[in-house]
């Protein structure tokens, strides 16, 4: 109520000073400034949304974690296409070669075992005389020595004769016979005798058919039947 008379008063003052202006016009141009005391603080507003600053640099990688558990096996894949037919001939050749190698190894092993059985031996000059002390007919002695890559022991001098005597220690076949020509003793390796050490009155072909020769325990020779069994002594190059 006090504000309206005050405004009117201000208008009157303005009119009297302006002259030709009407009060109504003056009213429109008057400014009213009211200067009061500061009001009380209003209520606290709601919490705003969090702000977003600039993106920082990427940090270093962390430590390697423990291995995970083994996963379940995957499903079986599709069946593959049928392969090409193999070369059966090449396989047969390989098998044949393997079989030949096995047979060779067997032969070498058997030879080694038989040589090992000849536990006694003696060297004389360029020869080595060995025995297994097994007694057998002359034909088997020849076969055994041949299988061992040797020959039946043949003394060609007194030294070799003594070596065979010491190895055999009993009667043993020598590689000497007259099977080809009666009374003409030859080496089984070929050639006529160049050394002999016959007992007295030997060879006598007693009862006929004594075509082989043995050395007895005193080192002397005796003609004997080839079917009789005597110790096998073989010789090898030393």
Curated annotation (Swiss-Prot):
Single biological process term from Gene Ontology: killing by host of symbiont cells
Q: What is known of its domains?
A: The helical collagen-like domains from three protein chains assemble into a coiled coil and mediate trimerization.
Keyword Zinc-finger assigned: no
Q: How is it modified after translation?
A: Hydroxylated on lysine and proline residues within the collagen-like domain.
Q: Which organism is it from?
A: Rattus norvegicus
Q: Relate the protein's function as given in its record.
A: Calcium-dependent lectin. Plays a role in the innate immune response by binding mannose, fucose and N-acetylglucosamine moieties on different microorganisms and mediating activation of the lectin complement pathway. Binds to late apoptotic cells, as well as to apoptotic blebs and to necrotic cells, but not to early apoptotic cells, facilitating their uptake by macrophages.
Record-level Gene Ontology MF annotations: calcium ion binding; calcium-dependent carbohydrate binding; calcium-dependent protein binding; D-mannose binding; identical protein binding; oligosaccharide binding; phosphatidylinositol-4-phosphate binding; polysaccharide binding
4-hydroxyproline modified-residue sites: 43, 50, 61, 67, 73, 78
Q: Which residues form the Collagen-like domain?
A: 39-88
Q: In which tissues is it expressed?
A: Detected in blood serum (at protein level).
Output this protein's name: Mannose-binding protein A
UniProt subunit comment: Homotrimer. Forms higher oligomeric complexes formed by the association of two, three or more homotrimers. Oligomerization occurs in the endoplasmic reticulum. Interacts with MASP1 and MASP2.
The family database entries (SUPFAM superfamilies) matched by this protein are listed as: C-type lectin-like, Triple coiled coil domain of C-type lectins
Which cysteines does the record link by disulfide bonds? 145-234, 212-226
